[in-house]
UniProtKB/Swiss-Prot annotation:
Binds together with bS18 to 16S ribosomal RNA. This is Small ribosomal subunit protein bS6. It comes from Carboxydothermus hydrogenoformans (strain ATCC BAA-161 / DSM 6008 / Z-2901). InterPro entries: Ribosomal_bS6, Ribosomal_bS6_sf, Ribosomal_S6_plastid/chlpt, Transl_elong_EF1B/ribsomal_bS6. Pfam families: Ribosomal_S6 (PF01250). Belongs to the bacterial ribosomal protein bS6 family. NCBIfam families: S6.
Amino acid sequence: MLRQYEVMYILHPELDAEKTESIIERFKGMIEQEGGEVTKIDRWGKRRFAYEIKKLREGYYVVMNFKAKAETAQELDRLLRISDDVVRHIVIREDK
């Protein structure tokens, strides 16, 4: 059963535009490869943090809405956690 999820992740601010897009496409491709469907991607761009995170003052924000199985969302969470380019992330299951 496909469920609706939202993921927000913050990428390292020193990545160039090409590398940033390739990372976004990599996570999108992973969801689609597992049988999920990405419904929306919002690129918020670089924003300043309220406080330092990993000695950084800003990051590139991305919000992605998708439909997928629970296992796919768990795998995405794992990949975001181990990626060196991701500063912070959160995966949320949206209520009906």
